[in-house]
């Protein structure tokens, strides 16, 4: 489940119309959400709040074996007025990332008033002097500041500076500083990661630099098909999307070189929708006889190749129903002949709370309803159906992941009252070992076994619960 600050950062990206999925780093995001999810390892409590549309805070406390915590603050020049912040109102599918439907590429807004749009203003008119200063000026560009302090020692400080330079460019600066030992006189270790992103909808480029070993990097993604910046009139909706990308890294200090390339093919929402009856004459001649969608379910295929290490990875993810999704991954190394196979699924469940009976029901309510029906006219207007409040729905998701060594992860995420709860467990093949061997295993909270269970380790990879509350 996403942290509250990560959720606010996604809300900032949506408010500024920045497409986080149009990036090479998100090429395998769907498979990673279904296969590489992490389970809580102990008890953690999160308390968060969006105090104002511009300011958010978050506090975390972890216990069982080791007590630690963190304090996080976030400031945004863009007002997040339409962002649900209460844990009882936040859509669970935005926090528990599962199958991610790829959307068609969208061209950035290139009008001259994009600063005012990002600043939350509808016009460039000057505000009266008596108004509050909650809305930024039209010339101010969208900016986000976030800082997190992890305690106890060794103290770690993480800071993030995010700024929209133009409709197609975004600058990100991330700092990580670690305090040394108490008796050490050396300066705290710190590293800076800068990233400049350029997204046009048709393609995207990312330029990276890290002070750690003076690492330079580049990532790029190209979407095949029509250019969203030059739309054609009366064009049919795009049914699928093929994307190709690559990344390269180089460090002149350590002479480190890294590169990879990948492909992604995914169906778009138009492929699973029913053809409309008001389509053009040319389209009706081909689709009028078949009133069925092009694809019965959304799916995503990816292929990633790392030439230097000889690694090849393929993934296949599909959403069989709105509440059920599957994913699988196969990896192979041409140099060592080692392979990896992982499969996983997620199942969403929704349960509505039964409506309580009327308080003043004395057993004669049926007679009163009969009398009201007799007094109403024959053609009385039909009342619209009552919509269920979000609080009347309990939604939860169960994720399962297993690899070729029978290492299993189970994760349940849901809402209990006004709390967001995540509970998970990791199991391995060492569970079939003898009790004496399990007694001589690593201490409680020990590390995760690798590659099918090492002799002498407990089969419990990690058991934990995470509880979150936000206001």
UniProtKB/Swiss-Prot annotation:
Keywords: Membrane, Mitochondrion, Mitochondrion outer membrane, Transmembrane, Transmembrane beta strand
Location in or out of the cell: Mitochondrion outer membrane
Predominant subcellular localization, coarse grouping: mitochondrion
Gene Ontology biological process terms in this record: establishment of mitochondrion localization; mitochondrial genome maintenance; mitochondrial outer membrane translocase complex assembly; mitochondrion-endoplasmic reticulum membrane tethering; phospholipid transport; protein insertion into mitochondrial outer membrane
Membrane topology: Multi-pass membrane protein
Keyword Transmembrane appears in the UniProt entry: yes
Function (record text): Component of the ERMES/MDM complex, which serves as a molecular tether to connect the endoplasmic reticulum and mitochondria. Components of this complex are involved in the control of mitochondrial shape and protein biogenesis and may function in phospholipid exchange. mdm10 is involved in the late assembly steps of the general translocase of the mitochondrial outer membrane (TOM complex). Functions in the tom40-specific route of the assembly of outer membrane beta-barrel proteins, including the association of tom40 with the receptor tom22 and small TOM proteins.
Oligomeric form and interacting partners: Component of the ER-mitochondria encounter structure (ERMES) or MDM complex, composed of mmm1, mdm10, mdm12 and mdm34. Associates with the mitochondrial outer membrane sorting assembly machinery SAM(core) complex.
Domain comment in the entry: Lacks alpha-helical transmembrane segments, suggesting that it resides in the membrane via beta-sheet conformations similar to those predicted for other outer membrane proteins and porin.
Protein name in UniProt: Mitochondrial distribution and morphology protein 10
Source organism of this protein record: Aspergillus fumigatus (strain ATCC MYA-4609 / CBS 101355 / FGSC A1100 / Af293)
Name of the gene: mdmB
